[in-house]
Amino acid sequence: MSRYLRYTLLTLLWVAVAAYIVFAASAVRRVRRTGTVGRLEIEVVDSSSQGHLVSAAMVRQWISHAGIKTLGTAVDAVDLTGIERLIARNGFVDKTVAYVSYGGTLHIEISQRKPLVRLLTDGMNAYVTADGYVFAAPRASSLYVPVVTGSYRPPFPASYVGSVREHIDLRLGEIDERIAELEREKYPLYRREMENDRNISALRRMRIKRQWWRLEGSREFDARVDALREKKAGLRRTYRYRAGVIREEIERIAGLQEAERRKQKKLEKSYEDYMKLLTFVETVEDDDFWRSEVVQITAKTTPSGALEVELTPRSGRFAVLFGRLEDVERKFDKLLRFYRSGLSSIGWSEYRTIDIRYNDQVVCKK
């Protein structure tokens, strides 16, 4: 085959492909202009054995209540973006995709978030994912995850939905802006302080010279010196008082800034404890024995602001005072050794509390 013929055939092939693409696109546009939605298929792509937070029936209800038309609607008129936004408004929905197939079926694919734990603490009723995303527990949800109860106060309001890290960063940014605003309040005070310092320096340079050209006598000169001394003493008192007032105001503002910085540290510590709690729940869930043994996790915020945990085990009638979420593996190892060498021989109903908060100690109370 000659080179010319080969190039000609190749060109015709590409022309045919381009023509097919144009024809197919035209056909799709024609179908979208004239076709209607005949079916609605909703799929929750990651339903698991734990249960579900969202169902096809719930999605149908949302779409119906929102007044978004689907079945019998022209394909081009279906508000796909509106459907996606409507579904995504629910915090327990991670991702959603809506599209209409060539055959006129409206497909809605939904990926739900995977909660790690449910918080039922201090007026809170929310699910939390392993990365700290929080969302309200939906009605009629049936998801089996560990539950944390108690008086623990998480670092976000009960109505919050979203990434807790983003919430913390927003709060920290607001505090930073408040600190900067307070710093700007100091600027006029700094200028007044510098002006006052210049006045004090000028006061020190004030002198009286004898006016020889006027043949000034000693008595007149002494009188002028006394008057200057009195004037300087009065100005000195004024400038010192003014310096004290300015410095006091600067220190007051600095105190407010320090209080804001303490808020930041407290907020960061609260977030750190929050993530430690999630890691703790993961540790329990990842261990076959403790996942079965730990029936309930009770968390509380101490007067100092620290997070402490108490466990209700399946075995016995006692509570395990776990304390702060530090050295978690060491504490669990210590508790397991006590289970095997202590309670197995003493009895599982002998104690009311088992305290493992202290290093190398297990303190039991009847």
PLM regions: where:
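Charged, solvent-exposed interaction patches on well-folded alpha/beta domains
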Residues: 1-46, 52, 64-366
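Generic alpha-helical secondary structure signal
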Residues: 54, 58-62
